[in-house]
Amino acid sequence: MSRDFQSPGSSDLELTLIMNYSLLIAAYLDYLIGDPWGWLHPVQVMGWAIDRATKIALKYCTSPHSRRLAGVLLCWGTILGTGGVSWLVIYACQWLHPSVGIAIQSIALASCFAAKSLRQAAEDVLAAIASEDLDLARSKLQMYVGRDTDKLTIPEINRAILETVTENAIDGVMAPLFYAIVGMFIPVVGAVPLAMAYKAASTLDSMVGYRREPYADIGWCSAKSEDIITWLPCRLAVLSLSLISGKPLTVWRLCWRDASQDLSPNSGWSECSYAAALGVQVGGINYYQGQIQSKPLLGDDLQPITSAIIQQALNLTRNNFLLWLGLMTIYSLCSTFLSK
């Protein structure tokens, strides 16, 4: 909701409070139902558009230079287009009725958060491990990770789960929340368009942001752009996580020591912060399509990664999310109260 949606007598602070209500509803919806299988999701629409555009670009752009140019257009066309369409949808719904606008805004914001999905994915694999069905655990894990899982041991499966939930805690939970909050304070924009634009950037990175062919050139802009726009929310999330973990000095010491070894400027920080807070070590040797790939070791190996450790990581993400949401709500309430 933006100033364009302002009804007579409404102030900017009141609009911010209304958007905060939508954010609270969205958080509850994600907690309650997550992303049900079979329901159309905005990321699916983004993925379809990105896939079609990428195939066309790869077909007609044959030189590295032309592919890089096409990649820039693909990246920012998708990001700005997603934000623009989201703005129009929210505007149209608000024009129909303010209640419709709030409802659609809440649903759209809920679709940007993946906290429930991450927890369900992790617990799905952990349930197979608990039932002592290693083959089932491997097959379920394969649905969520890119590495080869057919020969993984239980400790390796646990490490893969932890790395997945801690890496995706930023781009799937904290960064969308960050941009939703930022959007609330930008005139005319609003929470949904900015959060959706971020999801578009994240989806682009996951689909084309690879160093291997045929994506090395066409995906270069998407990968770099996602790195840049995730940098600030990642560091803020690490800061707040270090505080709620009760080990701020340990988390920052190990992040400064280890995080920069990772090729990604953000996932290394995210994974390392959790590893430091939990007293475990992530990284090591993985196989992708039969090819060995070694990732830097992050954190100190003080204890093994177990299902209990993974649950602690999921709870840290939830508490971090609730901390940001709570601070935003307190700010909105105090600002509205003090302005009267």
What are these language model-derived features?
Residues 5-6, 13:
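Short hydrophobic targeting helices and cationic amphipathic motifs
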